Amino acid sequence: MDELLSMLNFLGMKDPEELFSDIPKSVRKKSIGIGGGLDEYRVIDRAMEIGRKNKTDMINFLGNGIYDRVIPEAVNYILSKPEFLDSYTPYQPEISQGMLQSMFEYQSLISDLMGMDVTNASMYDGYSALGEAARMAYRINGHSKILVPESSYDSKISVLRNYIWGLNMKIMKYRIGEDGMIDLDDLSSKIDSDTSAIVVENPNGYGILDKNIFGVKDIKKDAVLISYVDPISLGVVKPPGEYGSDIAVAEGQQLGIPMNFGGPLLGLMSFKMEHIRRSPGRIIGESIDSNGKRAYVMTLQTREQHIRRAKATSNICSNQALLTLAASAYLSIMGSTGLRKVALLTIKHSRMIKEKLSSIGVKPYFSTESFSDVMFRLERDVMEALASKNILGGLKLRQLISDTPMKDATFFTVTEKTDAAAIEKLAAALEVI
């Protein structure tokens, strides 16, 4: 109290309220309602009390962008090391060799996974990576039209539209056929001399592993082919580099990053070497120092904080360096064999849920192979009823694509963690609600 009075006297004031005299009383709150101070034990007890309101034991069939994957404990151990957890953007790379090496290894791993030449040091998330890819396509050819599949979610298109605002670019949708895959004839009819980029998804927004992506390179003309992929699926399906992609992007949350109220996320972005000078973000390179020893450096960082704004390729600031470490640790621990097993288990469980729900009259929307997100025909809304039975699932496609004609399309998502018992419980619940 003596300290408070001393400070007020120094300021020529008598009451702390005078500090806020320039704020109109009509907008000031008398109390913020958090009560008085508590000792450490009571604070922890109160936090635990609030935390117990969360339901953490529910069976999860939700996905469509964020997935419940197994994360090896070693990933969390590596992330918790203070030299990684506490470090910031390495503005002085010569004293940040450990962080730069981890980012370099990440770039190498993702390039291998995508089958592409180069990977940047990360984007904020998958959707923003797609937006940056569209801007990159514009820098490559200067055209204004972007073709996206009608299976793209509203949220994805919203972010894409926000990124291309100001470039006078326009978005046009192309058709997905009755088999759940790209209608190549419809796509071909919409490609013209003004087409800047063609976006393909694999799996697409309907959850389908799309074999028709292999035909896009033959009809794309001089448009940039941008692939939006599921990184786990690359354990078994062909990578973007093998079907002619110029740029490949993905959401990397599944690579060792837990679900946490929708974030933080990790944008993966890879591309052909010929486009490296038009790429956004940073690229970490390997060089030799003055003593002839290996040194990691920031090879390219053409953001507007470093060069003239008119010549910058992005405005990305602190990238997702810690999360690139999570992805590197996850991929290194799992290896190609482990990643393949995870992908195969996911496909096995998608087939399992199709078979089980079909047996109770809930039919898959497509006979084509699905990956994690499996779409069924189900007229009624079941999310609330399932939640009352401790099951999360039943997301409607119309919640993701507002103008879809498939009003009965309903998702149930599986991962390697989904087991037969969980699917049995889901089927039993759907039979009675």
Curated annotation (Swiss-Prot):
InterPro entries: GcvPA, GDC-P_N, PyrdxlP-dep_Trfase, PyrdxlP-dep_Trfase_major, PyrdxlP-dep_Trfase_small. GO terms for biological process: glycine decarboxylation via glycine cleavage system; nucleoside metabolic process. The keyword Oxidoreductase applies. Its EC number is 1.4.4.2. GO terms for molecular function: glycine dehydrogenase (decarboxylating) activity. Gene3D superfamilies: Aspartate Aminotransferase, domain 1, Type I PLP-dependent aspartate aminotransferase-like (Major domain). The keyword Metal-binding does not apply. Keywords: Oxidoreductase. It is an enzyme of class 1 (oxidoreductase). It catalyses: N(6)-[(R)-lipoyl]-L-lysyl-[glycine-cleavage complex H protein] + glycine + H(+) = N(6)-[(R)-S(8)-aminomethyldihydrolipoyl]-L-lysyl-[glycine-cleavage complex H protein] + CO2. The glycine cleavage system is composed of four proteins: P, T, L and H. In this organism, the P 'protein' is a heterodimer of two subunits. HAMAP family: GcvPA. The glycine cleavage system catalyzes the degradation of glycine. The P protein binds the alpha-amino group of glycine through its pyridoxal phosphate cofactor; CO(2) is released and the remaining methylamine moiety is then transferred to the lipoamide cofactor of the H protein. Belongs to the GcvP family. N-terminal subunit subfamily. This is Probable glycine dehydrogenase (decarboxylating) subunit 1.
